[in-house]
Amino acid sequence: MTARVKICGLTRPQDVEAAVACGADAIGLVFYAPSPRAVDLEQARILAAKVPAFVSATGLFVNPERDYVEAVLDAVPLDLLQFHGDESPEFCQSFGRRWIKAVRVREPGQIEQAFADYHQASGLLVDAWDPNRYGGTGQSFNWSLIPESRPLPLILAGGLSSDNVARAIEQVRPWAVDVSGGVEESKGKKDATKLSQFFKEVHRVCKTD
């Protein structure tokens, strides 16, 4: 099998370059001011300019105002939108762009319902539930809550690192994995060695599958 990799929460050009060199399929830019990994429009333009052809630049939003999303789209060449809050399907669909929806998993049946509600998405990202934070928790969740029947590509996030990503891929068999804190030296600053180790584990398990 093949598992694609998205590196999220990038804030430095050299980290984009390192992620791409390791084989990242997508990089994530956070447009959510409370996050320690948030970038402004000028930072985002610089980072997006480092993203080559065939690697997706993804913009992450949490309960944004419509005007803000439109301002980002006007300023930054994003390939994909990621909505990580409580956005409605209608809101997500209204920008005329490809998008994915994040679900913070805490109970059985929640993922199945999200597949139905957000059926126009290009994928569903499943992450750990935290009552105080929208993602970026560094925590995993009970993967047995993920159904085998998946009408959309499933992206696995939540507490992934080189220590557990191989097991995650073997157990969940996701379309893609999404990592941020598991490849950092500090919030927003990626660690080249951790990036390399993460990709080695992904490639190892996919090759042997």
From Swiss-Prot:
The keyword NADP does not apply. It comes from the Bacteria. One of its GO terms (molecular function) is phosphoribosylanthranilate isomerase activity. InterPro entries: Aldolase_TIM (IPR013785), PRAI_dom (IPR001240), RibuloseP-bd_barrel (IPR011060), TrpF_fam (IPR044643). It catalyses: N-(5-phospho-beta-D-ribosyl)anthranilate = 1-(2-carboxyphenylamino)-1-deoxy-D-ribulose 5-phosphate. Its EC number is 5.3.1.24. One of its GO terms (biological process) is L-tryptophan biosynthetic process. Keywords: Amino-acid biosynthesis, Aromatic amino acid biosynthesis, Isomerase, Tryptophan biosynthesis. Pfam families: PRAI. Pathway: Amino-acid biosynthesis; L-tryptophan biosynthesis; L-tryptophan from chorismate: step 3/5. The keyword Amino-acid biosynthesis applies. Belongs to the TrpF family. PANTHER family: N-(5'-PHOSPHORIBOSYL)ANTHRANILATE ISOMERASE (PTHR42894:SF1). NCBIfam families: PRK01222.1-4, PRK01222.1-6. This is N-(5'-phosphoribosyl)anthranilate isomerase.
